[in-house]
Amino acid sequence: MTLLPTNAATGPGAARAPELPEARGEVSQALRSRLLGAGSGQLPGPAEIARCSPYGEDLHLALHLCYELHYRGFSGVPDTLEWDHRLLEARALLEHRFESALRHDCTPLPDVGEALDALLVEPADGTGVSDFLMSRGESWHLREYAALRSVHQLREADPHLWVVPRLLGRAKAAMVAIEYDEYGCGRPERMHSRLYAELMAALDLDPSYGRYTEAAGAELLAASNLMSFFGLHRRLRGALVGHFAVLETTSPPAASRIAAATRRTGAGPAAERYYDEHVEADAVHEQLVRREVVGGLLEDEPALAPEVAFGIAATCFLEDRLGSRVVDAWARGESALRTPLSHAAAP
């Protein structure tokens, strides 16, 4: 078992920034060089970004580099670059490419209530990641999935906090109440990000923030980037609420299945505790999100209904892409990571 270091999620070294990941194409290379103060400093323009796949490795690592400046930053990168106008211009081009593809490829249900109801319907085929882990997952599958999700789970609730100053009344009060739970109800040892770090340590993974970004493919980065994209733009507050509703609604059944997998594989109490917590807490949150957060927002700003529906559709679209990528690799007996985990049982 890995000992939980003091820089994992909380503790004296918690603010230590991660290392810059390696580039995955010309666009991310240009941004990486800018962050390091190397090279010509020339950043990609519309023509270069138009050549990127909107869901590909290069674009989503580039977006990840931009967004992480608003969280922990990177080792060796000046904090002043968070608001560097040239980086912000490049980020806007990347976001436009990403958003345009999502709005083309996603088909939101016209009624938000119908969209929320659809989230409660479990797929009959049971082919998702949590189904795989529950029915036939091995320890190495659990480790890979924990490493993948750590890219955003070690800051679990942070992106959704950006919506709080943009909400009013019922929606704001309910959102803060739910986030209070996410942050441990005032107890740092109960913060969900801390519980996730303890889960990682129990699975013999390094729980340092950003440790497994190199191993995460474009599908995971796109799902992670989506919440930052929604969170950083006030015009997308409805979409961020839709994103939040998906996570809180779909979490309990998936967490229940993964909790069963942790018990079957003997992952240990810390691994079980994280998923058990989400079975209990998110079951309560689901109704609060629907009635008060979504309901309150649409009472105050009914014109945002299409954006809430878009947020739901975009989140499901990217999560489905991620799930298919992971399960397809595992079904072939292969790793779902870009780089293998050290000390992992060989697939």
Predicted regions and their residues:
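Non-heme di-metal
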Residues: 2-347
